[in-house]
Each structure stands twice: as structure tokens, then as C-alpha cells.
Amino acid sequence: MVYPGPPGLIAGLLLAALSLSCVDGAKALGFVGHGYNLTVSQGHEAKLNCSLQGIEEPEIQWLKDGVPVQSADQMYIPVDEDHWISFLSLKNVERPDAGKYWCEAEHSGRKSVSDAIWIMVEGVPYFTLEPKDLSVTPNSPFNMTCAAVGPPEPLVIIWWVGDSPLGKSESSPSVLQMSGIHERTAFSCEAHNAKGVSSSRTAIVEVKGLPYPPFNVTISKVTGSTATVTWFPGFNSFSLIKSCTIQVQSLHGNREMYSRLISAPPFAVLLDELQPLTNHSVRVQCTNEMGASPFTEWRTFHTKETVPQLLPQNVHMTKTETSLLLDWEEVEPDREGYNILGFKVQWEQENATQGELFVQENQANLTKWNPEKDLTIRICIANAAGCGPWSEFLLAGSKEEAGKQRHPHTRMSWVPMVLGILTALVTVVAMTLIFLRKGRKETRFGNMLGSMLGRGGPVIQFTAARSFNRRGPEMMEATLDSIGISEELKSKLKDVLIQQQQFTLGRTLGKGEFGSVREAQLKMEDDTMQKVAVKMLKAEIFCSSDIEEFLREAAFMKEFDHPNVCKLIGVSLRSRTKGRLPVPMVILPFMKHGDLHTFLLMSRIGEEPITLPVQTLVRFMIDICSGMEYLSSKNFIHRDLATRNCMLNEDMTVCVADFGLSKKIYSGDYYRQGCASKLPVKWLALESLADNVYTVHSDVWAFGVTLWEIATLGQTPYAGVENSEIYSYLIAGNRLKQPLDCLDELYEMMCQCWITEPKRRPSFVDLKQRLEAIWGRLSILSASQDQLYVNLGETCGAAAAVSGLHSAFCSEEDYCAGPSQTCGTSAITSDYRYIVNPGCLREGNEWSSSAQNGEARGLLHEEEEEEEEEMQEEQVVITL
């Protein structure tokens, strides 16, 4: 049987096979071996195995906490005909992976279950309870709570008040009891265990006070007697506003005032029972649990004029032979603010003729009327707004018989007749259109079918929309013209286009939300092969605009030529089936040591942590600063500078990379973001957060955050602060704390990068000079001290401290240098970036991790990993 596998594993299987061959007879179905506990560091790999005997070609299922494990990293191999071993590999273990694992197999209705394997995941502390924002009354006691868990245990909690630690450490959970504060104070906590430290979010405790006065008092919808008042509440001083008081004052007559108390919100009120045509003033105050705010300034408004709400009183009528005299009680012209102009008199007689008369006095004389007919009269008081309510009708009888009945005029209604005619017309037109359309269809298809039947052909013919065959779909030719990008971008990329046949894709190096990076072998002009990295978009998520944005990054990189800036090798297009856009690929140099953030993080919390000298960290900073100095000189702004976007070359040189958000400045010195993009909020400058403005000065801010990342060996900036809270946190004057053991001069440089005014920040030229001065002083200081000698003459285990350092800083040529593989003595001098080869490396099988104990390999043994991976790719024939 042929299967791939490392020599160590193959040898173990051979021994197991030999031992099993000594057992006579058939074996009963069942798992062999015992369960065990496995402790794995967060972010590393765990390998599990179980052994089953008594069945040929079994189906072995892995379960975690009773749920089947859905993972592609499972395999099982035979030891002999009825003995199998199943392997489960968990890459990049996280806390949810902790739990109970076991194997199950079923045959002929009988189920067999293996012993359990318990996985415990260790990492930096994880907060289960973080400090919360509070609002407290002045000088009143309150508590803050913080809790975190491991493993590993134990862990301790240290409280910070502002930028100062309280000094004492407590076990988790920890309750901080405060007797009271009188001003705004920030609280946070740190959790420490053997794997490192985690920082909680920063909780802000505010002190309650009186609310500020309301503002933007607005009067709207004003009528003669009502008005709507709205306002915005002032700052509530961290105590909810419960009610508001509105005072209204009439500026007419005695200037009376009244107040109304309303619950809030809403912050609006309808004022009623106002006097018409009158000036009024209004002001507002609001109240919280601490008391009332000051009143606003008086706001004046004028009510409109309304029709008089008065009736004429004591109307008298005097009838003569030729006229009818009316009189009523006088009314003051400005009574109740109505500004009365006069009176309106209306009358009507039996024959429906009407008359109207306007008089200014409190009397009227009607002469144009027929005394032989009945007369009805009514009166109202009028002003400029209109007529008020009418008085009751007065009846002046005629001389004819009083009880004569009047018949109303009958009018013929034409509405039903018109509606009937229109309905009939619409029905006729609709039916006509339906018959005409049906006739056209019958004629068209009738001719077609008739001609075919006349020739003896088929009644129905059709053309296939799609054909199917076994040769697979045709491929669309992948060219720059086929992806729909601009002519300007085509011209920039034409000379760096590489045909897909010139390189071979290999393993995946990393994946992101929108794409992936894969290792590849590129065939050069001299027929040699060069290892490269290929960055490509995910095939299922892009359109033409996505391709253009992706390739624009390549166009930027084409213009770069600097040792600390990632250089473009070329671009390529991967053909796909016809009708689908090609997959764009950007070909970049292969960076052996990956990104700087992962390197720093693994040096701190890896399986075998190493201590990076300060000189090395400062050298990283200088490399990044040199790259950014070059970009700024080319009028480029990066907009996404961070350690995750800085790559480590084979000789540990740092290169600035990932220009997906970069922009070239063609005029002026700033670029304004015009659309919504996913932006690195915690690395953005204040002006970028506020106004979407990006300049070289905003890149300097991000460089300061990058320096902080390097000094903390990859910690997350503003840990515990949500992205939505970053702007408020920074505008309040807060900045990142000084890292432990960080040089004061370095932290001062970071703080200068975070100055609020952009033009007061230092340039990359100044920053590079200052960093080189620091590095020079550190090198002189180290050179003045004795050289550090490490005795490598005993076991290689004594050299563990330097072997990791060597693996991290030596190139492949240095790694293999030296005539002997025996242990010797190594001198480490002032330049910690290049270390003399210690000449003592264990064999790959000594460094490889055991599948049973689940130890993940560390970052510092990358060479051994690559050798083992190459061996695993070979096929080995085992004869049992």
C-alpha cells in the first residue's frame, strides 16, 4: 500500500505492524489506546489520533462534545488489514476548540467508542467582564468590576486610573471600590498570566451636574389662539432630563404670565388659549435629578388675527311700508383683540333672491326688498380675517297668507345619464381591442404553422439556448481588454503582464475577506524558477470595478524602487469559463518570514518565545520609516500603514507593502476620501476620522501607532476601545500608553506623531534621523560591553536560547554555512540583526512535534518545517 508520510510516522507504523503480526486469530472490533489530556497554546496546531482494530476499511468519525467534527484535515491509514489509525489536525487552535474529543466507528449495528482526549487551550487572558461606563453624583461611592479567565492560571488583575496603575494586584474577579470622584475619570484593568497581558476597554466615569440651558427654541404653526414651541435640550451633564418648564408672557395689557410643566421627552408643547393679534414671549428650562437648568432667553412671537367669536346682541327689527330698519347693541372696535371693522347683513326671500350689506355702524336700513314676500335676516361681526358666527334668523312675514307651502325647485340630474354613457363606451372599446389582438396572433402563428405543414416539415422548430458536452466549457481569453478596466490603467500594466503559463501556483499562504495569497514558482527568461507570492481576488465576489481597484494597487507598486518598499514583479490574469471575468493576480516577491505583526506576536506568545533586542526593534522602525520617506517623496499616501502590512524579507529587512488604500496626490497636499471604504480606524489620524482627509501627516500618525505596535511586540492598540468610540477617545486628549520597558525618547517620538494639528507632526525625514541616532547610541553602548558567549559544547538543549534567535535572523545561506554540524561557541556582538551561525541545530525529527502530545511547532523552526513538508510530499512504499 502506498501513502505519504514522514519517516518518524512510518517507522512507528512499521513497529506497530510488526507487533500486531504476532497476535493470532481475529481481533474484536474496538479502539485501542487510552485517552489523554492535551494542552495547546492559542494560535498553534494540535494533532489527535485514535487506533481501531477488528474491521477492514472502517468509517471512523471524530466528535467534539458530542457533535461531529466537520474538518477537512482528517485522514486514516491502515496498519494491517483490520487495524487502522485515524488522525485529526486542528490548525490555528482557538479557545472554542477546547473540549472533549473522541472517535466512533460502527459495523454491523455495533458501535465502538474510543477513550476521550481533552484539549485545553492556553493563551493571554480573556475578559469575561470589563469595566463599564458610569455616571455618578459628585463624591458618592461606586464600584467597578473586572473579570478574566485563562488558561493558564493563575492570573492577576491590575487596575489603572487614568494613566497610572493602582499598584496592587488582585485575583479575578476584582472589584474596585471608589469612595467618590469630583471630575471625569478613566478606569481600565489589565489581566496578567504566564502567556502575557490583556488590556480591557477603558471605562469613563462621568460626574453628574446641572443640565445646560435648552437651545434652538422655535415657534411654529402660529394661529390666532395656538402656537407650537419646540427646542433642543442642552447637555444633560450625564443625568437624564425628566421634565421641562415653559413660561409664557402676554405683552398686551397687564402682561400676565403663566407656566406649564411637561414631562420630557418629547421636547415640544402646544400652547393654547392665546389672545389673537397679540405679542407673546416664551422661555424654557429643563430639569434632571441634579436640578434645573437656567432659563433660555425670551423668544417673542405674534398671534394671528382671527374672526371675531362674538354674536350681535339685542337685534331689533322695525318694518315700514317701504323699508326695514335693523339695529343692535354696539361692540368695541378692539374688543378682545379682534380689531372689528363692521357688520355684515344677509337676507333671503321666498323666491330665493339674496342680498348682502356691509355696515360699519350698529344699524342698517333695507329698502330693496319685496314686502309682499317673507324675508329672513341674519347678522355677523366682521374683521379683516372674515366673518364671525351668524346670529339666529329673523323672519319678517309678508302680507299674503302665512301658511302657504313652498315647493322646492326640482332640477333634473344629468350625472347618472353621463356615467351610463361613459361606461358603455369604455366597454365597447375594450372588447374591440381584445378581438383585434387575438386575430393578429392567430394570423401570425397560423401562417407559420401552415407553411411548415405544407412542406411536410416539423410542426414546431426551436434553437437550443445551451448545449452540453463532455469536453467542458470553453475558456474566455484572459487579456487586459477583456476585464473592462480604464485605458490609462491598461497602458500602465501592459509592460508587466505575465502569461499564466509562466508560473505554477502552490500552497495557500494566507486568506482574507476579499482574496488570498498563494506561493508560486515563476519561470524566468533564463529558464530558472523563482519562488514568488501571488495575490488574487476571490473568484466569486468581484466585478469589473473590483478588478480595477485591485490592479490599481499593482500600478502603484510598479513605480516603486526602494529596498524598504515591496516591489511589483508583474500581473497576470487567470482564465475562466466563457461569460465569467478572469481572476486578476498580482505577482510579488516571496517574503520568507511573513508579516511583521505575526513575527512580533509569535516572539512574545509563541511556544518558544524569544527576546528581541532593542536594537533589532529600532532597526525595524528605521526600515519602515525609510520606506515611508520614499513614498512621501513620490507624493504617495499609504493610508493603511501598520505592522500587518509590513513584510519581513529573507535577511530580516522590513518592506512596506499592501497599497490597497494608497492614493497618489496630483495637486495640493491632501486627498479626500469620497466613498465609503473599510478603513483601519485605530490607525487613522484625527483629521481622517473627522473629515476623511488623508495627507502625509496622517501617514505620520499611523507610523506612530506602528512604532507602538513594535515596542509592545504586536499588541492591539486601544485594546478595549470600540471602533465607534475611537474619535471621542482621541478628541478628549487620550493617547496610547507608554509600553513597558520602552525608551522615553521613543515614546516621546510616538506622541509627537499623534499631535492634533497635522502640520506640527514631524516629517519622515526627521523621524528617520532621530531613529538612526537612537540606534547608533544603542550599538555603541552594546559594543562597549563584553561580548556574550554561549557554550554550545554540551547538549544542544543548552543552546535553545540562541538557536531560536539564529533561526529568526539568519538567511538560508547563513543557516547552512559552516563545515561542521557539531556544537561550538558563538559570539553575539552589538549588531543583533545578523548573528554568527552557532552551528548547532537539531535534526528535523528532534524538533518535530509528536502527534500524541499535540505540541505545535514554533515560529523559530521554520527551516525544519519546510524540510518535513517536502518529505511528506514524497510517496513511501511499505511492505508489511
UniProtKB/Swiss-Prot annotation:
The broad enzyme category this protein falls into is transferase
For region Disordered, the annotated ranges are 846-880
Q: Where is the Ig-like C2-type domain?
A: 29-114, 125-206
Organism, as annotated: Xenopus laevis (African clawed frog)
- Cellular localization per UniProt: Cell membrane
Instruction: Report the InterPro entries cross-referenced here.
Output: FN3_dom, FN3_sf, Ig-like_dom, Ig-like_dom_sf, Ig-like_fold, Ig_I-set, Ig_sub, Ig_sub2
The residues covered by the Protein kinase domain are 503-774
Question: How does the UniProt record describe the way this protein sits in the membrane?
Answer: Single-pass type I membrane protein
Residue ranges with Acidic residues bias: 862-873
Q: Where is the Fibronectin type-III domain?
A: 213-306, 311-401
Q: Supply the gene name.
A: tyro3
- According to UniProt, the name of this protein is Tyrosine-protein kinase receptor TYRO3
Sequence positions that bind ATP: L509, G510, K511, G512, E513, F514, G515, S516, V517, K535
What cellular component GO annotations does this protein have? plasma membrane; receptor complex
What is known about the tissue distribution of this protein? Answer: Detected in brain, spinal cord, intestine, lung, stomach, ovary, testis, skin and eye.
